[in-house]
Amino acid sequence: MEGLVRVPVREQEPKVRATNFEEVCYGYNEEEAVAEASRCLNCKNAQCMKGCPVSINIPAFIAQVKERNFEEAYHIISESSALPAVCERVGPRESQCEGKCIRGFKGDPVAIGKLERFVADWAREHGIKPKKAEKLNGHKVAVIGSGPAGLTCAGDLAKLGYDVTIFEALHRAGGVLSYGIPEFRLPKDKVVAAEVENVKALGVDIETNVVIGKSVKIDELMEKEGFEAVFIGSGAGLPRFMGIPGEQANGVFSANEFLTRNNLMKAFEEGYETPISHGKKVVVVGGGNVAMDAARTALRLGAEVHIVYRRGEEELPARKEEVHHAKEEGIIFDLLQNPTEILVDENGWVKGVRIIKMELGEPDASGRRSPVEIPGSEYEMDCDTVIMSLGTSPNPLISSTTKGLETNRRKCIVATEDTGATSKDGVYAGGDAVTGAATVILAMGAGKAAAKGIDEYLSGKNN
């Protein structure tokens, strides 16, 4: 029936894209975007907005796309989102905005993400920028980290007239958008750098190569540098491991390190001297989006790649689209299996993995059925590289050098969900530094909430 099926999106062929790092999805052209926008029912009580962590007025921007008012659509989106070109490319829209779309009850939900991406890409190609505050309000705010939480918080504060400086530890802004997500999913120069420039166009200053807690401490920013409030959006870059024998062998990487070498340091490009393992057979342990990114990157470097995950396909935490693309490209999924030991040769290099088969038992605290080992089912798989993708936690450098900043047992900063306020007066936090590794869009939502909290704090303090 008319309107039940969404307009398909063009992509690189799997066999072709598995050999390059160019973006997989081409996105909509103007005609496709207008046709897809026409499927929107423009609901008065739009459930899609309730599924959006940054509260974009989805029906309003889609209505403008339908009428080919693409610039107005962009301004509607950019009122709420500092990173519209990023969201669709990496966000779990099937469980957020599109998961709430009423069209999805009897057909395909409206492709909200693809429409947002189209508008953001159109704006970039036509030189359209977000609207800047008319004047500064005289208050200085420091933002630590230039990832999705930091960029969103900084952008929202700048729109309110605050003088905002972002301090970034690395040499390039973008945080996890720059170092953690591969080029074939999120182009760095075309998309990430352009989104960073849009935030700078709002008046935000970005200082790179500044490690807060080492180069300068939060207390010094507030007491000596004149910053009246600080937002911590430093992410969660400390990788977790399994604690099994052999993890210290040569050829074992955290997904964080493996992806950083490729994404930020361009190990995949000729002309760069960044060392990286070009394994012939790679085992990636884990089932999230980061595991898919690491596996698909290793594939493009020429490896046979196996994803080893202790639960089944239904329990994979990765986006369905990422799993689908990985399968299309030839990634092998070894599900309901778990490593018990990394096998090491006499020279200290990985030579294989000992794996035990699993079955699902009763649900655990997350609601997913717990994996249980099957006795006597162990076997060995040859490989020369193992990539651990088991999540990350915040680096304790900031919390350990900031007096009065409370953390929990996972070393995450304790902050209120609605405002991002921490235990230290004037200091706010959000994103992975608070929750541990989560999604880009949730980090953006936290940055947005903190910007509102900081504005309320400084407005009340100065009245």
Where are these regions (language model features)?
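Glycine-rich dinucleotide-binding loop and its adjacent helix/turn
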Residues: 119-135, 192, 197-211, 239-301, ...
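Feature captures the FAD/FMN-dependent oxidoreductase FAD-binding
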Residues: 135-136, 140-144, 196-244, 341-354, ...
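Ferredoxin-type iron-sulfur electron-transfer modules in oxidoreductases and energy-metabolism complexes
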Residues: 17-36, 57-89, 106-133, 262-263
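Iron-sulfur cluster-binding cysteine motifs and their immediate structural context
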Residues: 42-67, 86-119, 165, 172, ...
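N-terminal Rossmann-like FAD-binding beta1-loop-alpha1 element of flavoenzymes
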Residues: 139-165, 291-299
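FAD-site-proximal beta/loop scaffold in flavoenzymes
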Residues: 248-279, 363-437
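A conserved FAD-binding loop/helix module that cradles the flavin
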Residues: 433-460
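Rossmann-like dinucleotide-binding cores of NAD(P)H-dependent redox enzymes
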Residues: 163-166, 170-201, 205-207, 295-341
